[in-house]
Structures are given as structure tokens and as C-alpha cells.
Amino acid sequence: MSVTSIALRVETWLSATWHVKVPVTWLEACINWIQEENDHVNLSQAQMNKQVFEQWLLTDLRDLEHRLLPSGILETPKGELNGFFALQINSLVDVSQPAYAQIQKLRGKNTTNDLITAETQVTPKPWEAKPSRMLMLQLTDGIVQIQGMEYQSIPALHSDLPPGTKILIYGNISFRLGVLLLKPENVKMLGGEVDALLEEYAQEKVLARLIGEPDPIVSVIPNNSNQIIPRITDVLDPALGPSDEELLASLDENDELAANNNTSLERSCFIGNSSNTVPIRQSDFETELVISPRPREKPRNQSMLFTDEELDDFSLEEALLLEEAVQKEQMETKELQLLTLNRTTDESIEKFSHRSNTLNNFSFICKNGNNNWSEKNLSEQMTSEDKSLSCPSTRDQNSSSLSVNHNVPLPHDFTNKGKSSETYKIKQISSSDGHSLNNKMFNGELVSNVPKRSSDVPNENEHHLQTCSLQLSENSTGLPITMDLYSPPFIYLSVLMASKPKEVTTVKVKAFIVTLTGNLSSSGGIWSVRAKISDGTAYLDVDFVDEILTSLIGFSVSEMKRLKKDPCKYQKFLEGLQKCQRELIDLCCLMTISFNPSLSKAMVLALQDVNTDHLENLKRRLKK
């Protein structure tokens, strides 16, 4: 007898006896498998019927993808369901009892209140109704996920039913907002279980999710600072990421760890208003200076001290950091136009015109005299709104640098006359190591040498101003927005955002994953997951293409569905998921992204490790 004729008879028997409907393709495959297992011994029709039914009881209906429930049942507010429907129970919970009490009972922890109170709990009166059990079932026909509520007590059901149990619901069943109201006359137990669901829908795990308790799979979020922040997820279920302040702090800390150890950490003081800064005593200066920590800037001429031969000894990461520092200095060259000067005296902020002048390795020397701000070579008119003047504070006792070296044209020599007799002067200084200032004559007046460390200053009130640098406040990334989007080996996210492309643009960036913003899911036969990436200059929401996720997991969606039928092989898929999770967490590489400006998000098309070719491209870009 052919497999097709046997399948037709089995299909008729399943429908007539159990009201079970299955796809013909699955039925024929099941019959072939049963015959192979029995060495092609001719089985009677009754034996074949029984074995097929047993296999159906152990099958996950989601793999069959055979619709039974009417379409639109979830969208209909209320109605009645008529007929016979063989459904699968994924999980069930007794909603009449607190979930916390149930999970404590499962764990064998006795936390009843009468053990720690003076009085026992109030005994219910005889006439008071006892609380009745109410099970809430998560049901599926393989396509539609629907809930079933134990509207009246159903003896056939209990909370210890294994996930994947099959039941038959029949008769007239009312439903409200996607919930079937089940009664004893509507439910018949068929049995069965699904091994693949035993772990995912274990009773303890289901209750733990209800009370918001995390699943016991721990992962970490990289913050690029050698610190580990534990994050607890369910496979690839994302948790709340760190705050913006923590992310920015972590990026700053990473720069400090990866940069040269010879470069000291500076603290800067800004002339301007800030709600988060502390003013210096006004007796020291007529202008109010406020202290605010900021990320250390790498001196320009320090980065230029390295020759091409020395760059060969650098690691790739150090070379990338060096490139970023150079880009920051180029940004100051192109974008520096404004300077903010806020004074606490009654004088209003004056506007100054300037002549352009290139000052190499400049520093700000402050000396008590008349309150004149004298400078030569003035160019460009400066307002006091968007730029801030910053100088390292004398309060930083451990700072080993008294001048911030810049090899950029600086348009600021300015004069501000006030009531006191202090003179502020900017002069050009040549220093081989950037840590000392020589005695020089400037405008006929001797300017005293500034000690290397603030602890060497005999009178703090007379030497509060040290070397100062100019900080651009408009663009916190410090990167040139005019940078070519296709400059090899990569560009910066901030440059991409600032260029405001009108159409979909494909570029390369060197970035890492800050956090996953969505679950790993499969739809239409492809994997998908959403994440937020950063390169230290900006953040961007991205999706990953199926090819990347398939390579990380090791299995495609279709392969995963086949593996789910075999518990032994399915374990390999779970291991692949964990491997994918670890690699996404540690991911920091070159990403080819397709940026869609209308959606303000991108698609990651390819991943590539940094290699020596990229280092050579960086060298060439440095020489331009």
C-alpha cells in the first residue's frame, strides 16, 4: 500500500476519532519515519494510526504551522467559538494565588506570615466562600496564540501539566478580548508534551517572569573601560542599558586607558556660566572663573612627534586613537570662531575684532597688573555665546602639564579694560616637552616663569591662572564635519549625522554595540535583532542583516526549525545562540552600514576586523 493511501486513512481516523487535523506533508513524512523505524515491516492500519497519533502528541504544533482557529478571533472584542479544535498548552498559571507565593513554594521556601507575627492569620468564617482556582492557559494552534481562562473549575486541568500538552476544546465557547472562557464541558485532555518547551516554559520560569524576576542567564554590556556591568537576559532579551551619563563617562575612561600614559590628565577652568561648576574666589580675578572637569585633550605636537617608523610599533587601537586626536585638532582649526567671556562685574561683555595669527604651542600667562587683556594680531569678531575659554586649574595638584599645545591658527588677541590693575597676556611659547615656560620679555615687561606644578607656587592667590586652551562647545565630538564620507578606512558617526545626506548612504564606521534594543527574532525565514551602536562620537540605532546573524549563530531559521524536532541537535542551536550573544556583546570592529536619513537608523551589512591595511590608510590620512 502506498504512503499516500495510508496517509489518507490515518487522516480520516485522526479527524473522526480525535478531531485532529494535520498537514498532509507532515503526515506522509511521519508515516515514512515510522516505517523506517520498524524496518519497513508492514504495520496494520490500527498500529499505524496509534503511532502517528503518539507522534502528533509529542510534536510542537508551531512547527506544523497549520491554522485551526478562525482568522480575526484576536481582533474580535467578543463572540462565540463553535466546533472542535485540538490546541497545545504552552504554559499555564494559577492566577487566583500570588505568583510570588507560588514560586516560593516551588523553591521550598516557607515564608508564611504567621511564623513571624504574634497572631495567626484570621480564619475564614464557615459561610465565606473559599478562594477557587483559576488557571490561565497560553494556547496555540500552531499559528494563533490565544489565552484560555478556567471560567469554571475544570478537573482535567492542573498546574503540573507539562508544556506542550494537547487538549481538545469543543462546543459553544464564549471569548472576550482574545480570551476563551473555558468550562468543564468544553475541554477534553489528549495528553502529550514537547521536550523543547520543557525548559522555556517551566513553571518556575513562567512565575519568575510574572513577578519581573530575571532569568538566570547572565551577560555583560561592554562599556569600553575594562569594567563589567552584569546584565541578566533570556537568551538575547535586552535589559535597560546604562544612562547617557554613564555611557559618556565610560567612553572618556576608555580614551584615558588607551592613550599614552605619558599624557597627564588635565582639569580645565571655563570662563562662562554653568549650573554644575564651582566659582574661584573673585579676589583672585575680576573675571569669574568656574571649575569644570572635562576629558583630557592630547597635545597636538605630541602626536606629531611620532615618525612613520614609530607608528609601526603601535597597536591598531592606539593608531585609531591617535587619528581621532588629530581629527579633533583639525576641527578646532576649521570651526573655532567664537569665545565666551562672562564677567561678574557691572561691565557688559564687549565685542572684539581680531587679526588672524598662527600661534604654535600657545599658553595663557596671567599676571597681576592693570585689568587689561592685551594681544596682537587680532582678527574676526567674537561674540560671547557659544565658545568657552578654558584653562587648567591650579587646584589640580598632580597635573604635570602647564600648557596645552596646539598647532592651529588662533584668532584671539583681545583687550578688555576694567577697574582693577591686572594684565592678562597671550604669548607664543616654544617648549620641547610642553611642561615648562621660559622667562621672556613681552612688550617690555618681564613675565615670570611659571613652575611646573601648582604645588610649587608660593602664593596660590597670585598664581591661579595657568596655561589656557580654547574649547569648542558647539561640536562636543571635536571632529570635522567636512570630512569626506568615504575617507578610508572609516568615518565617524558624528560626521555622517552632520553631513545630513538626502538619500540612503553606505559608509564604513568603527563602532561597538552599546546595548541591544530588541529581542532576537525570526520572521519570514530570516533572523533580525536591533541594537544601538557608538563610535565614541555619536549613537545610532541599527538592524543587522540575516547573513551576519546566521554566521554568528551558526544556523539559519530553517535549520533551527529542523533542529527543534531533535532535542540532542537542538542543544547545539542553543549553544549557537549563546555564542552569538557573547560575540555581539564583545563586538568592536569595522561595520559597513546603510544609513537611511528618513528613518534615522541604519542597516549593518557587513563586519570586518581591523587589519594592517586600515592602519596604512590611517597613516596616509595623517600625512594629508
From Swiss-Prot:
Family per similarity comment: Belongs to the RMI1 family.
Pfam families for this protein: RMI1_C, RMI1_N_C, RMI1_N_N
Compositionally biased tracts (Polar residues): 390-406
GO cellular component: nuclear body; RecQ family helicase-topoisomerase III complex
Listed Gene3D superfamilies: 2.40.50.510, RecQ-mediated genome instability protein 1, N-terminal domain, RecQ-mediated genome instability protein Rmi1, C-terminal domain
InterPro entries: RMI1_C, RMI1_N, RMI1_N_C_sf, RMI1_N_N_sf, RMI1_OB
Record note on quaternary structure: Component of the RMI complex, containing at least TOP3A, RMI1 and RMI2. The RMI complex interacts with BLM. Directly interacts with RMI2 and TOP3A. May bind DHJ. Interacts (via N-terminal region) with BLM; the interaction is direct.
Residue numbers carrying N-acetylmethionine: 1
Entry annotated with the keyword Phosphoprotein: yes
Location(s), subcellular: Nucleus
Cross-link annotation Glycyl lysine isopeptide (Lys-Gly) (interchain with G-Cter in SUMO2), location: 334, 387, 425
Region of interest (Disordered), ranges: 378-422
Keyword entries, A-Z: Acetylation, DNA replication, Isopeptide bond, Nucleus, Phosphoprotein, Ubl conjugation
Residues found modified as Phosphoserine: 225, 292
Protein name in UniProt: RecQ-mediated genome instability protein 1
Domain of life, source organism: Eukaryota
Gene Ontology MF terms in the entry: nucleotide binding
Biological-process GO terms, alphabetical: DNA replication; double-strand break repair via homologous recombination; glucose homeostasis; multicellular organism growth; reduction of food intake in response to dietary excess; resolution of DNA recombination intermediates; resolution of meiotic recombination intermediates; response to glucose
Biological role stated in the UniProt entry: Essential component of the RMI complex, a complex that plays an important role in the processing of homologous recombination intermediates to limit DNA crossover formation in cells. Promotes TOP3A binding to double Holliday junctions (DHJ) and hence stimulates TOP3A-mediated dissolution. Required for BLM phosphorylation during mitosis. Within the BLM complex, required for BLM and TOP3A stability.
